[in-house]
Amino acid sequence: ILDVKYYVLLPSASYIGSSLDNVQWSTILRSVSGEGGFQMSYGQRPKPREIAQFLILDNRMPRSLIFCANKIVSNLQYLQKDAEQAPPSSAMANRLLMLEKDIDQIFDDGLHEYIQNFLLQNAELARQVEVDYRFYR
């Protein structure tokens, strides 16, 4: 959702900060049931960087990327507790946590690039979990 908002929804860069831009950001929060949690954490007037921070790096938001990555690591630790050796998916999941940066660095490096990299690593992790735990079709 963030990637689409960032690249597709605004007709041009001149609309950044406009009422259209602000409505779109608020709609994103509502679409992930995050408006109330965001307002409790950041206040009433949403700013794009704060919304991105909330949806990517805020562990208090159950749909944030970092919250989900932490849950993946936790669940894989549970699955491997009786294993003699940690499977490759364990290290891959921990690498997802290492993608955590501050939001300014993410915006400086490129939000689109960050999200694409996260999605790519998440897809590779999913394939490895399938192999490690024999979730074949």
Which stretches of residues belong to each language-model region?
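Alpha-helical transmembrane segments and their helix-helix packing motifs
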Residues: 1-137
